[in-house]
Amino acid sequence: MKFYRCSSPAPRFQAVTPGEKIRETSVLTSLVQPGAREKARQMVSGSSNDRFVVSRRRTGFGDCLWSLAAAWRFAKQTGRTLAIDWRGSCYLDEPFTNAFPVFFEPVEDIGGVRVICDDDINTRSFPGPFFPTWWNKPSFDCIYRPDEQIFRERDQLDQLFQSQRDSDANTVVCDACLMWRCDQEAEREIFRSIKPRPEIQARIDAIYREHFEPYSVIGIHVRHGNGEDIMGHAPYWADTERALRQIYNAIDEARSLSHAKPVRAFLCTDSALVLEQVSVKFPDVFAIPKQFQAPQAGPLHHPALGAEGGFSALTEMYLLARCDTVIRFPPTSAFTRYARLFAPRVIEFDLNDPGRLILIEDNSQALMAS
C-alpha cells in the first residue's frame, strides 16, 4: 500500500443537515419573546444588561454538539452567558422538554463560560434586542420560519463569527446548523466538558468492556438516510452499489493496517439494508441491536422512540470515538465528528473523489492507494 502525503488541510465540508428543513412551531419559539417590556424578560439571576448566546437545535447529536461548540466559542470571545435549548428534539416526544439535561449531566460552566442548560428554559426569557434581527418580531410572527430564513440566519451568524466582533444585541440566537463555524479546539472543549448521564455512560462502559477491550476495533459509521432527504450527503449515495463497494474497500484497507490486538469490526448505521449487506460481506461484523425504521421510511431516530432513541445514538457516538480506527461514510456526517477529533486513526472518503480514501493519523493526512 502506498501513502501519498497530502499537504492541504482536511476538506471543509459545507453539508447542510436535514435538520435545517424542520419547520418551527410556537412551542419552539417560546424561548425568545421579542418586543418591548424588557423588565418582564429579565433573567432570574441578573439585570437587563446581561447578554446571552442561545444555542437552539432539534436535530441529531452531531449537529447539536458541533453547533453548540460554535455558539460557545462566540460566548467565550464576547463574555456572554451560554443557554442550551434543545426543546423539540428529534429524540424526545415531549416538545417542551429540554433534551440536553435528559441526555447529559448538568453543567454550569464550560471553559469559563457560564451555562444555562436546565429544563427551566420554558420559564426563562431573554432581553432584546436580538440578533439575527428576525427574532425581534412579535412572537406571533415567529411561529413559522421558512427554510430561506434559516439559511439566511446561518449565513448572518457565520459572518458575525468570522468578523471576530461582538454584536450590539443583548441576545444572539443560534438556531441554525453551525458546522464548520468554529475551530477544532472549541469542539474539543465541548466534548471534554459535557458528559453523558451516568446511566448512559454505564451502558457505554459495559459494551466497551465486553466487546471492545480485547480487540483493536475498526468502527464503521455509514449514514444512509433510509429515504430521508440527506442533502449534502446525497452525492455519496448517487449509486448505491458503488457506495457499498467503497465501504467494503475501506474496511479491507483498515484491516490491512497494523493493529496491536486481534481486529474486530463495529458497524453503526441508520439503515437495515446497509447492516444486512455489510454483514453478508463481513460476517464477523458487530452491531448493537436497535430498532430500524421500515425501508425508505425516513430517519432512524424520531420522537416516537422516546428517550431510548437518544440513548442508543449517544452509545454509538461515544463508542465510535473509542475505536482504534474509524471509517466515516460519508465524512460530511456530524455524527462521527467526536470520533474524528479523538480516535487515533480515521479513514475518510475524498470529497472530490469518493473512490479515494484519506488516512488521518497523528494529525497528518495521506491518500491511500492499493
Swiss-Prot record:
Molecular function GO labels: hexosyltransferase activity
PROSITE patterns attached to this UniProt entry: GT23
EC number(s) reported in the record: 2.4.1.-
InterPro entries: GT23_dom, NodZ
Enzyme class: transferase
Swiss-Prot/TrEMBL keywords: Glycosyltransferase, Nodulation, Transferase
Keyword Cell inner membrane among record annotations: no
GO biological process, one term: oligosaccharide biosynthetic process
Superkingdom of origin organism: Bacteria
Annotated Pfam families: NodZ
Domain GT23 positions: 47-361
Similarity remark: Belongs to the glycosyltransferase 23 family.
UniProt function note: Fucosyltransferase which adds the fucose moiety of the nod factor on its terminal reducing N-acetylglucosamine end. Uses GDP-fucose as the donor group.
Protein name: Nodulation protein Z
Organism expressing this protein natively: Bradyrhizobium diazoefficiens (strain JCM 10833 / BCRC 13528 / IAM 13628 / NBRC 14792 / USDA 110)
